[in-house]
Amino acid sequence: MKEQLNQLSAYQPGLSPRALKEKYGIEGDLYKLASNENLYGPSPKVKEAISAHLDELYYYPETGSPTLKAAISKHLNVDQSRILFGAGLDEVILMISRAVLTPGDTIVTSEATFGQYYHNAIVESANVIQVPLKDGGFDLDGILKEVNDDTSLVWLCNPNNPTGTYFNHESLDSFLSQVPSHVPVLIDEAYFEFVTAEDYPDTLALQQKYDNAFLLRTFSKAYGLAGLRVGYVVASEHAIEKWNIIRPPFNVTRISEYAAVAALEDQQYLKEVTHKNSVERERFYQLPQSEHFLPSQTNFIFVKTKRVNELYEALLNVGCITRPFPTGVRITIGFKEQNGKMLEVLSNFKYE
């Protein structure tokens, strides 16, 4: 057994609504607002696509997801040879880490970001440098100071999970210009579709300028397919060729591929969902207490407080399951009614 596994623990999901009801003696409905899922669900066309292909379940998937690859290639205007799919971004991160890292290698990322960058590096016996956040966001200058010719991977999450903050195009361009050209910079844009900031990076354009800039996106968030597990990376043809050796032959299921293609084709539905999210998100920042909220470009808001357990339980008491962290609580933006209940709690809560 790998000794470094002793440094890690298996992922622990939050308690189910039923378990929470029993623990806290809560009556009535509970809403799961802890995992940043798209509560509106996928496009109706996704359900139609799934129903149309149920008779194919006994077939193995087509390896490499060629139908979805062609759709993504057209959507992003990138060559198919530069795209690799995984069963969610979790698997994409795992494949890249497994392909690149050897014992003693070093990755550089941030503290308080998506935990799978750290997790998979430790599994591969690599060292992890985690730079503290600055004003709740990635400190690109601080990360740059830790990067050198021997760095194996740099992981950036934009917008960042769990804080919701982002860095802009100019900042990323400047950062990439100073990273050694052979050091891969992985930019995780899982929440890209929710972004409304005009100065958010055009990472695809930056890829034309920097061969070591690699882009990750997913169908789990705005497209509403978290239960079907489809994520992908857009990288250099050479990197994809090598990483593809690591990919399990049938990692993305046949139904998942059909569903993702249907979701991608219904951009009007995506626009409707992301617009609803931005409208509801703005309601939180209209509160006088929003000084305690980190600025978000996602479908969640990070609320800073020293009284984490008290806030978590106060939100739970109005039927909203959220996600506590050491320095605050992450709230998935819900429907109007759910948000109204949370806004009432947040407007009366004592944060210090």
From Swiss-Prot:
GO biological process: L-histidine biosynthetic process
Positions bearing N6-(pyridoxal phosphate)lysine: 221
InterPro entries for this protein: Aminotrans_II_pyridoxalP_BS, Aminotransferase_I/II_large, HisP_aminotrans, HistidinolP_aminotransfase, PyrdxlP-dep_Trfase, PyrdxlP-dep_Trfase_major, PyrdxlP-dep_Trfase_small
EC code(s) of this entry: 2.6.1.9
SUPFAM superfamilies, sorted: PLP-dependent transferases (SSF53383)
Keywords: Amino-acid biosynthesis, Aminotransferase, Histidine biosynthesis, Pyridoxal phosphate, Transferase
Pathway this chain belongs to: Amino-acid biosynthesis; L-histidine biosynthesis; L-histidine from 5-phospho-alpha-D-ribose 1-diphosphate: step 7/9
Cofactor: pyridoxal 5'-phosphate
GO molecular function, one term: pyridoxal phosphate binding
Organism domain of life: Bacteria
Gene3D superfamilies assigned: Aspartate Aminotransferase, domain 1, Type I PLP-dependent aspartate aminotransferase-like (Major domain)
NCBIfam families registered for this protein in UniProt: hisC
Record-stated family: Belongs to the class-II pyridoxal-phosphate-dependent aminotransferase family. Histidinol-phosphate aminotransferase subfamily.
Oligomeric and partner information: Homodimer.
Name assigned to this protein: Histidinol-phosphate aminotransferase
Gene: hisC
